[in-house]
């Protein structure tokens, strides 16, 4: 996009709304967008050829939204997705809801029918601002070209500020076509940003420090907010200085080094037993950047019953929503931790730390790399597969789908850096992994990127294999094929009288499917085959799909039944592990 001023006179030149849109994206530092063209967004696509922004053509708008999501999670920058009106816009809904639940900064730009046709049920007209209002931080309907730049600038500011999230800008076709002279040097208001929380008062920080000094069994719960605020280094320094152990939510994995002596492990419904029991025995809970999701707390009335609770959270709406806390610090987590650290004294927690080590010994192997222990399986065990994958590629970016494999990887893979685990947490969106991995690879082209998906989830957006191949991306895909919707089947087995209604899958030949898309396909049914396949995939310059044929009866343990207490864990029946303390 160029030519905004006359070469001789310097007077501003007219630009179409579509030209303004691309210049806005360039000014925001956007390097890549993901999208799918259609009638109402065609003026924008027509102007795209003059832009430096790269466009990745998805095969479905949901895939494009997940690509933008994966890009944002891997890079920390705002992901951008484009779609046309009507079905193009509605196909974004699942992707926007996924980003909203997990606080991922996205800007979705949709075309809309001409202004004069709004409200007339015109071809491909949908009130997309109305549809997406509950699943975006904010959205805009733009009907004039001069409104585009302020809306886009504000959308980016909103998406990345405070608690991040998706913002949608719906632009009518005539606004894209019409021309205007824009004062680019003028100020564009960002009115919503004045509502951001102020810095936490020092008096409140002093209260928190006093509560920490008074504790004997403190525990830090690290959530996604640690990564979002760039607070991983600050958390490490805080925990080491105070000698406080750390547990992580699913989206908090990687925010604190998994190999660190103070790291307890994954918490919640499928978390390690000692981590959940530690929560129930702690006398102080420091909840950092987490929202007390039901998969983490179990029965809220019995969560951490002996603990004083401090909640550091940027979103005031999350404070007291599920768990009542004794002290809420609303603000940026990194800022809070860095300001508290100079006055932070070590907690006398040697007895507490020794007790936690005893609990680990009571509930499984002392070596964290050997937990969870292998259950009895018929054939290749999925835990063996995931352990092999991580042992061969410990520094990779892992993008997982949703289901049993997602929980096994959280138990097995020892993530030690932020943004190396990308997964759908809050919404639990099957079909997320493959397109999200494409976005992650676009954000981090030098990184090794792996998809881990079940045979059910991989088929929900398998059309994006073609996007992967067309873009020339080296991504490896591990399909954990148990011939069933594994988590559904597990719940049917445990809680619904083993009545397996509609959970069995008839699958395609995944090796042939990969080859049809231009990838290399492999199949593994033994541990030896698995190891050789993973090594071959890593050595291959082309994208590779490996189908791991695993035991269809394997279950994820431990599991806390929905609504039960954290200590009410169900364990693998054949393992001699105590259920509670």
Question: Where do the language-model regions lie?
Answer:
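Glycine-rich phosphate/diphosphate-binding loops that line cofactor/substrate pockets in enzymes
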Residues: 20-30, 71-76, 100, 158-163, ...
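Glycine-rich, anion-gripping cofactor-binding loops and their flanking helix/strand elements
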Residues: 73, 224-310, 416-446, 461-463, ...
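Thiamine diphosphate
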Residues: 42-115, 117-118, 123-124, 274-293, 320-322, 407-485, ...
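Active-site diphosphate/adenylate-binding microenvironment
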Residues: 18-21, 36-39, 44-46, 360-440, ...
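Glycine-rich, acidic loop regions that bind phosphate or pyrophosphate groups
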Residues: 3, 8, 110-151, 252-356
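Conformationally flexible catalytic loops at phosphate/diphosphate-handling active centers
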Residues: 126, 154, 158-214, 365-371, ...
């Amino acid at each position: 996009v160029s030519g905004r001023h006359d070469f001789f006179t310097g007077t501003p030149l007219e630009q179409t709304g579509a030209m303004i849109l691309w210049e806005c994206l360039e000014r925001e530092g956007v390097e890549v967008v993901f999208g799918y063209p259609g009638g109402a967004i065609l003026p924008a696509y027509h102007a795209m050829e003059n832009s430096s922004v790269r466009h990745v053509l998805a095969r479905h708008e949901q895939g494009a939204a997940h690509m933008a999501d994966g890009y944002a999670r891997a890079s920390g920058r705002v992901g951008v997705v484009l779609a046309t009106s009507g079905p193009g816009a509605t196909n974004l809904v699942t992707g926007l809801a996924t980003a909203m639940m997990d606080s991922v900064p996205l800007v979705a730009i949709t075309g809309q029918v001409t202004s004069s046709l709004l409200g007339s049920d015109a071809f491909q007209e949908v009130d997309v601002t109305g549809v997406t209002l509950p699943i975006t931080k904010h959205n805009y309907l733009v009907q004039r070209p001069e409104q585009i730049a302020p809306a886009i600038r504000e959308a980016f500011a909103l998406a990345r500020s405070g608690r991040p999230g998706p913002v949608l800008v719906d632009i009518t076709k005539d606004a894209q076509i019409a021309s205007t002279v824009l004062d680019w040097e003028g100020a564009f208001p960002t009115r919503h940003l004045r509502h951001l929380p102020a810095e936490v008062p020092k008096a409140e920080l002093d209260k928190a420090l006093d509560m920490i000094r008074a504790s004997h069994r403190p525990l830090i719960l690290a959530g996604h907010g640690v990564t979002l605020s760039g607070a991983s280094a600050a958390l490490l320094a805080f925990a080491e200085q105070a000698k406080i152990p750390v547990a992580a939510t699913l989206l908090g994995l990687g925010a604190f080094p998994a190999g660190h002596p103070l790291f307890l492990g994954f918490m919640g419904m499928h978390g390690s037993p000692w981590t959940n029991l530690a929560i129930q025995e702690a006398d102080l809970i420091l909840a950092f950047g987490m929202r007390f999701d039901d998969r983490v707390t179990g029965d809220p009335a019995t969560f951490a019953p002996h603990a004083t609770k401090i909640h550091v959270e940027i979103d005031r709406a999350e404070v007291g929503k599920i768990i009542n806390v004794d002290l809420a610090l609303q603000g940026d987590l990194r800022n809070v931790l860095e300001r508290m650290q100079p006055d932070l004294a070590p907690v006398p927690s040697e007895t507490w730390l020794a007790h936690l080590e005893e609990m680990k010994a009571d509930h499984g192997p002392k070596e964290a790399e050997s937990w969870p222990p292998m259950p009895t399986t018929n054939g290749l065990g999925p835990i063996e597969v995931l352990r092999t994958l991580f042992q061969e590629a410990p520094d990779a970016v892992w993008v997982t789908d949703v289901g049993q494999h997602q929980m096994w990887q959280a138990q097995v893979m020892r993530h030690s850096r932020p943004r190396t685990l990308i997964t759908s947490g809050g919404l639990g969106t099957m079909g997320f992994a493959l397109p999200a991995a494409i976005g992650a690879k676009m954000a981090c082209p030098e990184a090794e990127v792996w998809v881990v998906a079940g045979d059910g989830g991989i088929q929900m957006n398998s059309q994006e294999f073609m996007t992967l191949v067309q873009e020339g991306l080296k991504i490896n895909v591990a399909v954990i094929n148990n011939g069933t919707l594994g988590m559904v089947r597990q719940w049917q087995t445990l809680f619904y009288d083993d009545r397996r209604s509609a959970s069995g899958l008839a699958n395609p030949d995944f090796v042939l499917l990969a080859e049809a898309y231009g990838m290399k396909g492999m199949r593994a049914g033994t541990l030896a085959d698995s190891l050789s396949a993973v090594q071959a995939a890593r050595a291959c310059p082309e994208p590779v799909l490996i189908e791991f044929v695993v035991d269809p009866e394997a279950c994820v343990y431990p599991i806390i039944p929905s609504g039960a207490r954290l200590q009410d864990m169900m364990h693998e029946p054949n393992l001699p592990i105590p259920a509670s303390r």
